Amino acid sequence: MNPRRKKRLTIILAISAGLAAVIGLVLYALSQNIDLFYTPSELVEGKGPDKIKPEEGQRLRIGGLVVPGSVQRDPQSLKVAFKLVDNGGHLVTVEFDGILPDLFREGQGIVAQGTLKDATTVAAFEVLAKHDENYMPPEVADATNGMHFKPEYTEAQLKGSKQ
């Protein structure tokens, strides 16, 4: 092999090795962020066999059932805090500053998108409620595994809705 071909082969192999290393590092860095959906149990315990937990400040989506009696509204603003649960029994607090969807109720499935504040608190910038009484996002349906709570209303709530 003459020196010119040897030099070309060396350059091509070096570029190929560098490109493979860059692609490998990018895929490794993205491996923890490919799946953004978490259930309350996965958020607390970690996801997958490696028990990978999201970092504080990371954007994510979390889905579960709103715990009855956990909704707390700030009377001075639109801030709302509520707890989510799944079949693992872990609770995660979701804080949201905005108008909740009309179909948002305690005991119903929701998906919230936001950032992780601490190990069990998500600051949501979007809250999605389920469509109708039969629809539940597949991710939430798998996570809750039939743990749907039927909403219970007080007499005052029932009378207030008929006005």
UniProtKB/Swiss-Prot annotation:
Record topology, Periplasmic segments: 30-163
Pfam families found in the cross-reference section: CcmE
Keyword Cell membrane attributed: yes
Record's keyword terms, sorted: Cell inner membrane, Cell membrane, Cytochrome c-type biogenesis, Heme, Iron, Membrane, Metal-binding, Signal-anchor, Transmembrane, Transmembrane helix
Record topological domains on the Cytoplasmic side: 1-8
Key word rRNA-binding present: no
Domain of life: Bacteria
Subcellular location, record wording: Cell inner membrane
CC annotations in GO: plasma membrane
Residues annotated as transmembrane: 9-29
Main subcellular location of this protein, as a coarse class: membrane
Any one Gene Ontology molecular-function term assigned to this protein's record: heme binding
Binding site for heme: 131, 135
GO biological process, one term: cytochrome complex assembly
Membrane topology, record value: Single-pass type II membrane protein
Function comment: Heme chaperone required for the biogenesis of c-type cytochromes. Transiently binds heme delivered by CcmC and transfers the heme to apo-cytochromes in a process facilitated by CcmF and CcmH.
Family designation: Belongs to the CcmE/CycJ family.
PANTHER family found in the cross-reference section: CYTOCHROME C-TYPE BIOGENESIS PROTEIN CCME HOMOLOG, MITOCHONDRIAL
Name the UniProt record assigns to this protein: Cytochrome c-type biogenesis protein CcmE
